[in-house]
Swiss-Prot record:
<feature type="domain" description="MPN">
    <location>
        <begin position="102"/>
        <end position="224"/>
    </location>
</feature>
<feature type="binding site">
    <location>
        <position position="173"/>
    </location>
    <ligand>
        <name>Zn(2+)</name>
    </ligand>
</feature>
<dbReference type="InterPro" id="IPR020891">
    <property type="entry name" value="UPF0758_CS"/>
</dbReference>
<comment type="similarity">
    <text>Belongs to the UPF0758 family.</text>
</comment>
<feature type="binding site">
    <location>
        <position position="175"/>
    </location>
    <ligand>
        <name>Zn(2+)</name>
    </ligand>
</feature>
<dbReference type="GO" id="GO:0008237">
    <property type="term" value="F:metallopeptidase activity"/>
</dbReference>
<protein>
    <recommendedName>
        <fullName>UPF0758 protein SSP1105</fullName>
    </recommendedName>
</protein>
<dbReference type="InterPro" id="IPR037518">
    <property type="entry name" value="MPN"/>
</dbReference>
<keyword id="KW-0645">Protease</keyword>
<dbReference type="InterPro" id="IPR046778">
    <property type="entry name" value="UPF0758_N"/>
</dbReference>
<dbReference type="Pfam" id="PF20582">
    <property type="entry name" value="UPF0758_N"/>
</dbReference>
<keyword id="KW-0479">Metal-binding</keyword>
<dbReference type="Pfam" id="PF04002">
    <property type="entry name" value="RadC"/>
</dbReference>
<dbReference type="InterPro" id="IPR001405">
    <property type="entry name" value="UPF0758"/>
</dbReference>
<keyword id="KW-0378">Hydrolase</keyword>
<dbReference type="GO" id="GO:0006508">
    <property type="term" value="P:proteolysis"/>
</dbReference>
<keyword id="KW-0862">Zinc</keyword>
Length: 226
């Protein structure tokens, strides 16, 4: 049976859109990568055939491009796509300690972002999401423009924190003028984020302002306590 012959609620892509990737079976996830089938066989059939050739999912990373290419209906192009996906998954799972950035103090955060922010001609507001060991698990640009407490929504930042299971947050933004003195809007924004973090139990560790080869920590300067 072709994928197109399935009811919409049974098709892998539609199921992912409606329910999320975590609700799909191994075969359905592979079928999305395989994309198209062969005569008489859907991508889901080929995915099931691939799964029958291994004992467990961990074996996928050991399959060579040649091994994948031998599975009827895969072919070289799909074999390359699958191998690339398996390699990415392996790298995500086994990232070395060297790949992990730990933030132990405001200087660490400033050093991490200084080169990316100090020469910008407009303000950029970034959130760093940390795990329980203060290792960065995600970085997100919240907005670019002129900082205004009305446009930095705690909801956007903290919903992202919940999504990536973050224990704490550090926010940073730059002052194109090079002067790191916090504005009234900087202080208002910090207060709103801190209050929201206190309610949710996801601590705002600092708000760091990047200037010209320098930085200011709002915690170190006494604008708020942690």
């Amino acid at each position: 049976m072709k994928i197109n012959d399935l009811a919409n609620h049974q098709k892998p892509r539609e199921r992912m859109l409606n329910y999320g990737a975590s609700h799909l079976s191994h075969a359905e996830l592979l079928a999305i990568l395989i994309n198209t089938g062969r005569k008489g066989y859907s991508s889901l059939d080929i995915a099931n055939e691939l799964l029958k050739s291994i004992v467990n999912l961990k074996e996928l990373k050991h399959l060579s491009i040649n091994d994948l290419n031998k599975i009827k209906g895969v072919g070289l192009y799909k074999a390359l796509t699958l191998k690339a996906a398996f390699e990415l998954g392996e790298r995500m799972h086994s990232g070395s300690v060297d790949d992990k950035i730990q933030i132990n103090n405001p200087k660490d955060a400033a050093d991490f972002m200084m080169g990316k922010m100090e020469h910008l001609t407009q303000e950029k507001f970034i959130a760093l999401f940390l795990n329980s060991k203060n290792i960065i698990i995600k970085q997100k640009t919240i907005f670019m423009g002129t900082l205004n407490s009305a446009i930095v929504h705690p909801r956007e930042i903290y919903s992202e924190a919940v999504k990536c299971a973050s224990n704490a947050i550090i926010v940073l933004h730059n002052h194109p003028s090079g002067d790191t003195t916090p504005s009234l809007e900087d202080i208002k924004t910090t207060d709103r984020l801190r209050e929201c973090g206190d309610i949710l139990g996801i601590q705002l560790l600092d708000h760091v302002i990047i200037g010209d080869h320098t930085y200011l920590s709002m915690v170190e300067e006494g604008y708020f306590d942690i």
